[in-house]
Amino acid sequence: MASSSSSGSSTRSSSPSDPPSSFFQKLGAFLGLFSKPQPPRPDYPHAPGNSAREEQTDITEDIQKLGFKDVETLLLYLNSSVKGVNDDKQLLLERLIQLLSKLPPTSTNGKKVTDGLITGLWESLDHPPVSSLGEKYRFREADGSNNNIHNPTLGVAGSHYARSAKPMVYQNPNPPAPETIFDTLMARDPAKFRPHPNQISSVLFYFATIITHDIFQTSSRDPSINLTSSYLDLSPLYGRNLEEQLSVRAMKDGLLKPDTFCSKRVHGFPPGVGVLLIMFNRFHNYVVTSLAKINEGNRFKKPVGDDTAAWEKYDNDLFQTGRLITCGLYVNIVLVDYVRTILNLNRVDSSWILDPRTEEGKSLLSKPTPEAVGNQVSVEFNLIYRWHCGMSQRDDKWTTDMLTEALGGKDPATATLPEFFGALGRFESSFPNEPEKRTLAGLKRQEDGSFEDEGLIKIMQESIEEVAGAFGPNHVPACMRAIEILGMNQARSWNVATLNEFREFIGLKRYDTFEDINPDPKVANLLAEFYGSPDAVELYPGINAEAPKPVIVPGSGLCPPSTTGRAILSDAVTLVRGDRFFTVDYTPRNLTNFGYQEAATDKSVDNGNVIYKLFFRAFPNHYAQNSIYAHFPFVIPSENKKIMESLGLADKYSWQPPQRKPATQMIRSHAAAVKILNNQKDFKVVWGESIGFLTKFPTGENPGLGFALAGDAPANQQSRDQLMKCIFSPKAWEDEVRQFCEATTWDLLRRYSAKVQDKGPHLKVHTHEIDVIRDVISLANARFFAAVYSLPLKTENGDDGVYSDHEMYRSLMLIFSAIFWDNDVSKSFKLRRDARAATQKLGALVEKHIVEMGSLFHSFKHSHSAVSDKTNGLANGGANGHANGNANGHTNGNGIHQNGGAAPSMLRSYGDLMLRRMIEAYGEGKSVKEAVYGQIMPSIAAGTANQTQIMAQCLDYYMSDDGAEHLPEMKRLASLETPEAFNTLMKYLFEGARIRNTTAVPRLVATDQTVEDNIPCLPDPKDSTFLRPIPNPQQAETTRTVKLSRGSMVLVDLTVAAHDATAFPDPEKVRLDRDLDSYTFFGLGPHRCAGDKVVRITMTAVFKVLLQLDGLRRAEGGRGVFKSLPASQWNGQAGRVAGEKPQWSGLRTYVNADESAFSQTPMNMKIRWDD
């Protein structure tokens, strides 16, 4: 092979001033291609025939072959190499090949560029690869094996500990006695407890205990053996090997046994540690329950029949995937909540985190840090993680009492090692081997195997409120004396490096004096007496003798000893970046889209903190969505109050301790629904707090609380009366609404559909496809509301709007969801925050629009002025609304309605007229701002999403086998332009919505009540989807008296009420003789939808257009349906059902397009049609 050095008689030195040569030299220097020039070699005429020696040419010949375009290519190559990113649209590789092909085969520089190209191509891939296909690499093994696919036993449970630092300093053969060291340097004086300087709570140290025992469990038989894996795989919960793992699994549906954890050792720690593990157990069970419901890509298809192998695979796939997700949340808590608190980042408004999983790009100037290489923990870090000085006073007492009882009444501070460990052995063996039979802190298991929430929450609340101890000398509780003595003996038996050797190993400066270790003269003098030289101080207990770090904001929050502070960060990076399941295999495909999202951090919430998800999934019925206890449990609440006040965020959180939310009772019969929803005195609406949150002014005033749906007081009724006066519908206006919506629907079909296929003779039949929910139904509703309220919507005509179609719908949907669909406590904090921002932004634009019109129509005053001068200026002319639709169109040859001009004049000006009427109706002496947030914005929020849901469910019914028989007749009616045909279509719409719609409305019970209820319908045993009930032939016999206590909640299931044969005869059939005002999906009673007379026209108009499409059908496969699941409430543990035995409710949950989250409404469904 040719040498890479320059040689031969043709070689000459290039002058530094020679620009082309200088360029190649610089390029070579960057690319690492050039070596030192070699002297010319002699010409030997008798060289072997295959000698690698051949003549090479220099830059002179290269320049003769290249042009300016080639120089540009080299510059581009250099830039790409430095950045590590190649924009292939610039065809760099192809241009480089063109350049190289021009150079002579003997070109020295050409060879070097070629070598650089080969190096770059080689480094594009991992060598060797770190991830692999195959079932054995798909999930975490119970014992941690196969994490490194090339060294499968690296870090496996039962391995020997590794050694980090080389011990070279001569060890004193007669070191000080561990008992003396503990009594003088480590023991805590009970009267001199030092609270943690940063007011860190005990919960952080409980979490640290889980981490420590996740990766360190020393064998009592052979202290060089680690009984657990070297990975953060939650082995205290899941077990250290397959046998232990099986003991905690339910072996059904991927579940863990309720409220269990595998490790017996955990029962020897304060009960808060066990509660945290139970919370992870509950999170796991929530996740696997959700995975089974969603069944992403049919990967968790439930077997049918008695195929044992299939059922075992189903259970295992769910369990293992759930474990990956739960460990994903665990590691995110470690990296964000835990490490941010350690670094005091929780005290500043910054979302920066130390995340070892960062995706490093490959470039000329740097190479990515290796990842997924595995890990094996070392003895040094086993000693680093002994943080007994952080034990709180309460936990000191608990541990002392527990050990005293285990020792038969003897003080643990005076117990000998044999006595101590004999007692611990007896204590551990006193717990049953079956995790489900164990108790915790005196709590007893319920019938379903779980613990009562209140007992667990009490332990956790007290732990959050209990400040931990400070690091530093003389602060380890006396009850830990035997444990610490054992630790020192183990460190000596392991022959670990000294404190200075370890510090040097991790890159820290060696201590030169004892005062460098700790400036406290007492501590320094004791160290000098024990060791004689700083270089001789043992790692353990040396790290306990170090002075703790000061509080630095941000930078130092845990305030550990200096060596510990640096070491734990290195270890965190190593544990995470070396773990295949946290790096190269931590993907949505492996965790599912839902699982990946469920474990993910969101920097817009708590600057990335994620532990609130654990709290809300474990205890969904106790913590408020903004509870400081759930969002920041690693610092005591009183200190969190100071932190949040300094950041201006104190009002964002609730400072109340957790308490159980009111119990909810389901009401099903139509008669009971009518009774409750018409009784405003004893049953109150519950949306006032949410509406008020969205509309509250910074100054404290809150006009939204007076809105119609915010309460049942006279002021709320007055708001409804005002709103009803503003929503007028003369016959001519109804026609214009219909025309507007039909034209808008045709325009949306034209704008957002795609031609996907040509077929038939001469390919003249064209097939079109569109997402009918996302791009038609949702946007038609958004455009209508934008027109009615003069909202600033952009159009294709270039109108000066603010929101696109989809942006407007998302904003309206967000606001609606925060008021009416806020039932997932783990998502509520972000939902409410985003909805308030959307409300304030849109409200400010509406207010600005009204103020601008005030300069034209003097009936409008400045936003802070009273509205008192009532004129008809706007009604007599009106400015153009922000959102104008298109109507008067015609159908072109492609079956899509074309633009035909402006919207009908009356609807076009109706938006401004509506605003004027609402402001005037709001009352004398009120400002425009009050009217906007007290009446206009809440009324805007109350509509769009509900109509989208109703229409989507109706269309789905008629496109299913259940309702398809009606399509031909509906299509015929849709082709007719008569009022009768339109009204008949409306009846079809209402019937389809009644059969498929899912609506339930809550009420707060204001006084003790009794209600007669019954069960109108039952699940069809032949229907696995639970979509189709059957009428209950013994409905009357199921009548029962429901006792409702003051302060409890009722959920009136209007879905079941819509299938009640006493109100809707033949409830499962489409009948066109029902009264349109009898339907329940707009609500019942005084809070029934105020605008139902209007929206029934808008919905029918959209429905009519869709029915006119030729060959209307679903798109192929799953794209043509929306995934619908029976709705169920998560109550903290699998199988736990609150209240009565569940019946058919008809309520459904949906999933979004990528199946990463649940939704209250269908979001996507693609349809096709031909022309």
Swiss-Prot record:
Impact after mutating residue 946 to V: Forms only small amounts of the 7,8-diol
Reported consequences of knocking out the gene: Impairs the production of 8-hydroperoxy-8(E),12(Z)-octadecadienoic acid (8-HPODE) and 7,8-dihydroxy-9(Z),12(Z)-octadecadienoic acid (7,8-DiHODE). Does not affect appressoria and conidia formation, nor the infection of rice leaves and roots.
Alphabetical keyword list: Calcium, Dioxygenase, Heme, Iron, Isomerase, Metal-binding, Oxidoreductase
Location of region: Epoxy alcohol synthase: 675-1171
Binding positions for Ca(2+) per the UniProt entry: 214, 229, 231, 233, 235
Annotated catalysed reactions: (9Z,12Z)-octadecadienoate + O2 = (8R,9Z,12Z)-8-hydroperoxyoctadeca-9,12-dienoate; (8R,9Z,12Z)-8-hydroperoxyoctadeca-9,12-dienoate = (7S,8S,9Z,12Z)-7,8-dihydroxyoctadeca-9,12-dienoate
Fatty acid alpha-dioxygenase: annotated segments: 114-457
Binding site for heme b: 213, 388
InterPro entries, per database record: Cyt_P450_CS, Cyt_P450_sf, Haem_peroxidase_animal, Haem_peroxidase_sf, Haem_peroxidase_sf_animal, Oxylipin_biosynth_metab, Ppo-like_N
Residue numbers annotated as active site: 385
Positions bound to heme: 1089
Compositional bias of kind Low complexity: 1-22, 881-895
GO biological process: fatty acid metabolic process; response to oxidative stress
Region (Disordered): 1-56, 873-900
An example Gene Ontology molecular-function term: isomerase activity
Family: In the N-terminal section; belongs to the peroxidase family. In the C-terminal section; belongs to the cytochrome P450 family.
Subunit architecture: Homotetramer.
Function: 7,8-linoleate diol synthase is a bifunctional enzyme that converts linoleic acid (18:2n-6) into 8-hydroperoxy-8(E),12(Z)-octadecadienoic acid (8-HPODE) and then catalyzes the isomerization of the resulting hydroperoxide to 7,8-dihydroxy-9(Z),12(Z)-octadecadienoic acid (7,8-DiHODE).
Protein name: 7,8-linoleate diol synthase
